Amino acid sequence: MATTGYRHGIYTSEQATSILPARTVDSAVVFAVGTAPVHTLAGDKARPVNVPQLFYSYDEAVQAMGWDADHCSDYSLQELIYSHFAIYRGAPVVCVNVFDPEKHKSEVADESLTFGTSVLDKDIARLAHGGVCAVELKDELGETTYEAGTDYSVDAVSGLLTRLAEGSIPEGGTVKAGYVYADVSKVTSEDVIGGIDPASGQGTGLELIDEVFPRFRLVPSIVLAPQFCEDPAVAVVMAAKCDGINGLFQAICLVDIPSSGDNAVTKYSDVPGYKEKHNLTDGLMVVCWPKVKLGDNVYGLATHLAGVMAATDGDHDGIPYASPSNKRLDITSSGYVGADGQWNELWLDLTKANYLNGQGIYTVSNFDGGMKTWGGRMACYPSNTDPKDAQDSIRRFFNWYQAQFILTYFAKVDEPLTRRLGQTFLKSEQIKLDGYAAREICLGGSITFDESENPVTDLIDGIMRFHLRITPPPAARDIEAVFEFDTDNLSALFG
């Protein structure tokens, strides 16, 4: 306690602890950009468009983003929300919905429908689309216009029409409907990529990754764009946004090589060529192929791999030093969607799966113990073989450790540059590294403050430079044993 004037007695004071505990950093914070059925939300609820939303549970995400059970595959964030929360129990997830029902919409001029086709209610008819507005009903000949509230009512969210008994629509009558509906197919890759509005300065799409830490104090570590990441233009931007988040942090992105639609790659031997042709070779990118299926739902492998990463980290104290390769996938098959829209299963043997791994591609293996992830390499492999760049667990550990270092010592910025300050860094980090080594999270690590790396010109300008050497364990990808027939043991035949 500070006192002034004449002192007479015993006084105490406090000094900052010379050793700092490490800041906690989540290792598997997913940042995902895509589409959600926000038009299904109740009328009094906000419809989040290009606003980061933080979720820790399935229920929380559905309540905030809406849910369309009849068109699950049409909304890419539904794929992630179900996979990550319901299947793999991962958290947290930050979602950005770019589907704007006020902007992305289409018009139907003359849809014919008949009341009474429902076996449950003879006064019910359903429009082909939900999320409707400006509904206009006419008789079958288009001569009489029916009045909403008098002849019929409409549920704008579901597109459900109800014939009112006191109205003029005949029982079992056929009508023609015109309306405008929210059309998620109007969302493009450009919406997901996003940018900065020059007038308002507001970010959209992937650009909003820089708002995650200021809003939620979470560092994004895994970037996803389900379905849209199959567009190489989106994938390349995802990788670019992973580097220098808030000017400080790094993440990795998980992308899928297309295995449905016009650009589908259906042969394993064609996958590496597609990867190279479209420049999917970034050191912060993981490339996945093919798609996977659970029940009737088809997913991008990248979506499931994100869940496996979160689960693997959770099994290792929330520290990303173990590879998510050779871990169980909660799927029933892997394959691709053909031009006819039908699902085609793929059964890659170990040789084919290893070929893809050797080209820096994650895939699915059913060699032992069911369907499992099979990979371990970042997209930069085999061109870049530096362990910190090429091995996924080491890359993620470096990203995580650097974020922890930044946040642990950020409060020390602008403190007096003294020997005590340097010792705080050295002692705190070495204690932590020794602890990691004892727990075999790292094989070893050290931190130094070398005079040779800190010239006087930097020191007088307030620049301190520490050198950390860390060795997270490589994944044991190739385990070999040599067997030999030992003739010496033949002597046992003679007692």
For each feature predicted by the language model, list its residue ranges.
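A glycine- and small-residue-enriched flexible loop/hinge signal that marks low-structured segments
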Residues: 2-59, 66-106, 123, 128, ...
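Short loop/turn motifs at secondary-structure junctions
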Residues: 131, 218-219, 441-443
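Acidic, low-complexity glycine/serine/threonine-rich segments
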Residues: 388-452
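Surface-exposed beta-strand/loop patches in extracellular or lumenal glycoproteins
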Residues: 110-129
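Short, ordered beta-strand-loop transition motifs
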Residues: 151-160, 258-259, 292-294, 454-462
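Surface-exposed interaction regions enriched in Ser/Thr/Asp/Glu
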Residues: 136-137, 141-191
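Sequence/fold signature of self-assembling virion shell proteins
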Residues: 274-277, 299, 304-307, 427-449, ...
